[in-house]
Every structure is written in structure tokens, then in C-alpha cells.
Design a protein with these regions (language model features):
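N-terminal accessory segment detector
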Residues: 4-20, 30, 34-51, 55-246
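Surface-exposed ligand-recognition segments of extracellular binding domains, strongest
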Residues: 1
Length: 246
């Protein structure tokens, strides 16, 4: 259940959840250099069960690709023993480092997902699909995020500071310039895109949908315009927030 927020699991087909298991859990043995290690899934929340559950098992023979993941719905997995689970050394993993690791883990979903979207559907459709998804996500999560960083809804200045706060949280630099009822945000660095290599510029349009959606929830009388893009060679990425011309 931890993967999906609220009732989102209701919209996830079984095949999508199984694809994640095939691409991740089933390949842990390969990644660890142990071809006998496979994963047994005993439950999935998307199938109406108590949640994603299962266990890793070392078999007596090397597993073929189709054997690395097995489904045994209804089987009771071994109880979790917290005392036996690996523990991070506190001296090497202080709280600040753990917070950054969790942040980077979350970013990795988008960092790896957007290029795959372009591979599967092509750059133009990836921009459309990603942007629409981003707008919905941005709009849905704006209220909760804004409350956590103490941003009040309404006004260009407030949303500019919202964008800057999230940029700083991602490890980038950001500045805000407010002029009357308009505001500009300049963001240096795009941590999310590090390691992308040569990727189509349409991926930026997909990612930018998050900000468009958040702005709709913040103040629907405002519009967001991109005025510079670091991924296209500009020194930084900039946005202008102003009252809509419509």
C-alpha cells in the first residue's frame, strides 16, 4: 500500500503492478550475482489483498528469467523480523544523509520514468502524456505540499516562493523576483535530469506540467510561462508568473 497514495491503487491494473515486480524484485538475484535467488509474491493490494507482500527465496538451481518471479496468492509469508533486518550504521548515516537519500529515491522514479516514456511512445506523445499526468499530480498535491512549506494560496509571489522552495528541496538553486502582481523564478541546475545524456527536449514539457497543475490549484487566475531553459543552453531555467491574459 505504501506505493500508492489514498485510493490511487484502485486505478492500477494488476499487469502494471506485476510489471514492476518483474522489472525490480525479480532482478535482485541478477543484480546481486546470485542466479538462484527469486521472489515469491503472496499478495498485491491491486488484487484486493492486504498489500504487496512476499519473500525472497534461494532455490536449488539457477533460475530462468520466467522463474525469477512466482505468484502464490493466499500463502502466508514468513513474519518480518525487524531485529534480523540490516541496519544502517548511525555514524555513517546521520539524519541529514537519510533525508537526502529518501529525496533522491523519490526523484529517481521520475528521473528514470520520463526517458522510458519517450522510448515507448515517442517524444511528442511523451510530452503530452507526461504533461497531463503532471498537471493532475501537481493540482492534487499542491494543497498538502503548500501547507508543509507554509505557502498560502493566491498571488504570483506565493507561487514563486512555492517553486523556489521545491527547487531547493531537490538540491537545485533558485531565486525569486517579485514585481507588482507578477513574479519570476530562476532555477539553476536540474538535478532530476542528471545522467540523462541526450534526451528529447519534450521531457522538460512533461515535467513542467507539475508546475502548471500546482499553479491551477494555487490561483487559477494566474498563468505560467517558461522564459529560459537550461536544458536548451540557457544559463538557467526561468518562469514568469502573471495574471492570465484570457
Amino acid at each position: 500500500r505504501w506505493v500508492f497514495d489514498g485510493t490511487a491503487a484502485c486505478a492500477i491494473p494488476t499487469d502494471v503492478s506485476r510489471a514492476m515486480l518483474h522489472g525490480w524484485y525479480a532482478r535482485n538475484g541478477v543484480s546481486l550475482g546470485n542466479p538462484k535467488l527469486g521472489f515469491v509474491c503472496t499478495s498485491q493490494i491491486v488484487d484486493g489483498q492486504h498489500g504487496l507482500a512476499g519473500y525472497f527465496q534461494e532455490f536449488e538451481h539457477e533460475l530462468a528469467p520466467e522463474e525469477r518471479l512466482r505468484f502464490r496468492p493466499g500463502e502466508m509469508p514468513p513474519p518480518f523480523d525487524e531485529a534480523a533486518a540490516p541496519q544502517l550504521p548511525e555514524r555513517e548515516w546521520p539524519v541529514d544523509r537519510l533525508i537526502k537519500a529518501k529525496r533522491n529515491y523519490a526523484i529517481e522514479y521520475i528521473r528514470t520514468g520520463l526517458p522510458r516514456l519517450a522510448e515507448l511512445f515517442g517524444p511528442v506523445d511523451a510530452a503530452f502524456l507526461g504533461r497531463i499526468a503532471g498537471r493532475v499530480i501537481g493540482a492534487q498535491y499542491y494543497k498538502a505540499i503548500a501547507a508543509r512549506i507554509e505557502i498560502a494560496p493566491g498571488g504570483a509571489a506565493g507561487f514563486a516562493h512555492f517553486m523556489a522552495a521545491l527547487a531547493l528541496g531537490e538540491g537545485d538553486e533558485a531565486s525569486v523576483n517579485v514585481r507588482g502582481n507578477e513574479a519570476e523564478v530562476e532555477r539553476s541546475g536540474w538535478r532530476l535530469a542528471r545522467g540523462w545524456g541526450d534526451q528529447p527536449p519534450e521531457l522538460f514539457e512533461a515535467w513542467n506540467g507539475l508546475w502548471e497543475g500546482a499553479l491551477m490549484a494555487h490561483d487559477r487566475s494566474l498563468e505560467l510561462a517558461v522564459t529560459a531553459r537550461q536544458d536548451l543552453g540557457d544559463a538557467a531555467t526561468s518562469w514568469r508568473i502573471r495574471p492570465t491574459s484570457a
